[in-house]
Amino acid sequence: MFLNTIQPAVGATHAGRRVGRGIGSGLGKTGGRGHKGQKSRSGGFHKVGFEGGQMPLQRRLPKRGFKSLTASANAQLRLSELESIAVNEIDILVLKQAGLIASTVSNVKVIASGEISKAVALKGIKVTKGARAAIEAVGGKIEM
């Protein structure tokens, strides 16, 4: 097989319909466009969202909210998720490699949700009061 010999399967393609070539073709004179009007002219059609002069929907509805740029930079982590990591010394890089936080995250905070039974050392990770108590109760430590 060569690139210059490749062809579509028999019957897979159809010739384009020739319009404006006489009454007998079924698509003569107006060529399937109907009579007069903007849509019958060449190059004549309204822009997307145009509603004939009526105020378009995208302008009738109010603007609402915004996308926070800091939302993707911050993440929360549960105590029970720390339990699943095999390493004892945990920092943001370890969490990214474990797939617990997104690669765009730069700030992580551990919240007191779930339980932890092994001692872990957190580096550069913020914790809530309840999470700090739970981690230190099992012999873990938190470094900033």
UniProtKB/Swiss-Prot annotation:
Residues 20-49 are annotated as: Disordered. GO terms for molecular function: rRNA binding; structural constituent of ribosome. One of its GO terms (biological process) is translation. Keywords: Ribonucleoprotein, Ribosomal protein, RNA-binding, rRNA-binding. Residues 21-31 have a biased composition (Gly residues). PROSITE patterns: RIBOSOMAL_L15. It comes from the Bacteria. InterPro entries: Ribosomal_uL15, Ribosomal_uL15/eL18, Ribosomal_uL15/eL18_sf, Ribosomal_uL15_bac-type, Ribosomal_uL15_CS. One of its GO terms (cellular component) is cytosolic large ribosomal subunit. Belongs to the universal ribosomal protein uL15 family. Binds to the 23S rRNA. Part of the 50S ribosomal subunit. This is Large ribosomal subunit protein uL15. It comes from Neisseria meningitidis serogroup B (strain ATCC BAA-335 / MC58).
